[in-house]
Amino acid sequence: MDDNKRPLYLPFAGPAILEAPLINKGSAFSEEERIFFNLEGLVPYAIETIEEQASRAYDQFRSFNNDLDKHIYLRNIQDTNETLFYRLVQNNISEMMPIIYTPTVGLACERFSKNYRRNRGLFISYPNKDRIDDILNNSTRQKVKIIVVTDGERILGLGDQGIGGMGIPIGKLSLYTSCGGISPAYTLPITLDVGTDNPQLLEDPMYMGWRHPRIGGEEYAEFIEAFMQAVHVRWPDTLIQFEDFAQKNAMPILERYKDRYCCFNDDIQGTAAVAVGCLLAACKAAGTELNQQRIAFLGAGSAGCGIAEAIVAQMVSEGISDEQARTQVCMVDRWGLLLDNMPNLLPFQQKLAQKCANIQNWNNFSDNISLLDVVNNAKPTVLIGVSGVPGLFTEEIIRAMHSHCARPIIFPMSNPTSRVEATPKDILHWTSGQALVATGSPFEPVVVDGETYEIAQCNNSFIFPGIGLGVLASGARHVSDAMLMASSRALAECSPLAIDGTGPLLPKLEDIHAVSKHIAFAVGKVAVEQGLTLPMSDEILQQSIEGNFWKPEYRRYKRTSF
């Protein structure tokens, strides 16, 4: 029987019900419920449906003049009535996703302490490091199955936001529910408050976090270890998603824990998975294979290198050697093209640095080999931007790329919109509409020579909700590389571009539920094949996916004694 058809038995009544966001129905409580739960007179007389409530809420949403106010309004609904919040978002997903997540969430993080209204999630501060178990036990969520955790050091492209980074876990988990059908009762946002190196926050009298420079080294590592162990004891089967950790910590944390616990890093692995899915769809539209592409990256941090490694793995799966695949990938950062003779490269960068011997025949390049030098010599067919610096994909670079590639694949993926390497409008005009474009933030359709081009948002929300649903439905103990690769292929299979040559690389957000279920099945199937969960048939896996897919509908309540 569908959970939404079963009555929910509650041992309390009166105002306490109206103060519980997971339970509150507001004006939708039936006459019987109002009597049994002592709610008569506490809500207006009229009994409304959830759609009537959502219609009123949407009118109120539209009355706000700026996106931050809209964000705050939606968060207030979420903190009052989560079922209504998710029905409202589900009904208006394309309009509201940029409000509850990127790009608006960046401003919400910057103003988190100033706009703080009500608690949500857990703040685990370093001075309380010996009481992490107690803090986890304080959570109002008892059956946590997915945690999104950040330390606030690298929030989007905005840098260190301290505890203001909590906006990211809250936003991500909102997408797990609205896109992936994960019950909000199973989600928990957590911020690890290890101080901040942002002087504006340290000097801000309203800042609500621990006023102390960030800890590092052994202190930081021991704190993370204590947190991971405590979570595993409290909720041994939960999926932990790492979010917006600084480059120096993100990869080491992932490497340390990915084989010990069920966890993944969305900035590294989720971004990589959605980028590869986009690339596979673009290659199919261009009539070629990924292993035939030459790829240039602008940005060689953990996210960029994570994408590059995922691309290499996919190329290898298509039949070329690992060594050959790496010669086809050029990583450019602020110091130019990464070369194997460069000092101070991070371990994950060293594996992607080009051998100096590979560029001996290049012409007219500077001491620090620029992106334009790479475009003119390596002649890439794919250009991916994860630099966080706006405007670096110049007209000269894009036109140079188009001169040797009829249908260049160009992904300016930096967030938020203000930090994008080039706008889709410019890219499509510079390439006469021939570029295959996907971006990290939402953009309006572009018209070139009378043709309208929909712009795909290469957003992790197309991937991580499906991964989470697949892990929950299958009971996977770990998130393997093969599961992530399966998610990319499943996403590519959903691309509308195969049907419409001017369509977007990725599906519409209105189709996100079907996409997430498709990805969840692919992820869960690989988990079963790899022995990361109990054996189950495809039919049972599909049933589990449907059974775990929560819908924003009110349940009937019955009263029970304590």
Curated annotation (Swiss-Prot):
GO terms for biological process: malate metabolic process. One of its GO terms (molecular function) is oxaloacetate decarboxylase activity. Divalent metal cations. Prefers magnesium or manganese. Disulfide bonds: none annotated. The active site is at 101 (proton donor), 172 (proton acceptor). Gene3D superfamilies: Malic enzyme, N-terminal domain (3.40.50.10380), NAD(P)-binding Rossmann-like Domain (3.40.50.720). NAD(+) binds at residues 154, 267, 415. Its EC number is 1.1.1.38. It catalyses: (S)-malate + NAD(+) = pyruvate + CO2 + NADH; oxaloacetate + H(+) = pyruvate + CO2. The keyword Oxidoreductase applies. A divalent metal cation binds at residues 243-244, 267. The keyword Ligase does not apply. It comes from the Bacteria. Pfam families: malic, Malic_M. The record marks 267 as: Important for activity. This is NAD-dependent malic enzyme. It comes from Shewanella sp. (strain W3-18-1). The lineage of its organism: Bacteria, Pseudomonadati, Pseudomonadota, Gammaproteobacteria, Alteromonadales. The gene is maeA.
